[in-house]
């Protein structure tokens, strides 16, 4: 029944509105509350760098420092660290938000 209701709408028709709602009601607030290093880590992940060793190397930080930020970002639900040695974004379409609206200097 639900599929029948959604059938007239193509995904490309509803994604812009979905992205706008995520941006206005969630992602702007989440991004504004991240520290500078949090933002750099999340930005690097959004660029496809997922291995913690590569993230550390990109930022020039120690394993201990990255681990502190990793834990904090996981607790906030921003990143997923369930796979050993890897970090991914946990929020739907957050990568698109970052690439569209956020400027980060590494």
Regions found by a protein language model. Give the residues of each.
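C-terminal leucine-rich, beta-strand-based interaction scaffolds used for sensing/assembly
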Residues: 23-106
């Amino acid at each position: 029944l639900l599929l029948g209701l959604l059938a007239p709408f193509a995904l490309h028709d509803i994604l812009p509105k979905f992205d706008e709602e995520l941006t206005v009601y969630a992602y702007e607030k989440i991004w504004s509350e991240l520290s500078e290093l949090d933002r750099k880590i999340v930005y690097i992940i959004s660029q496809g760098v997922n291995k913690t060793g590569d993230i550390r190397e990109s930022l020039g930080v120690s394993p201990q420092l990255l681990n502190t930020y990793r834990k904090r970002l996981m607790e906030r639900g921003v990143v997923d660290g369930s796979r050993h040695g890897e970090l991914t974004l946990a929020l739907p379409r957050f990568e698109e938000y970052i690439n569209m609206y956020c400027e980060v200097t590494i």
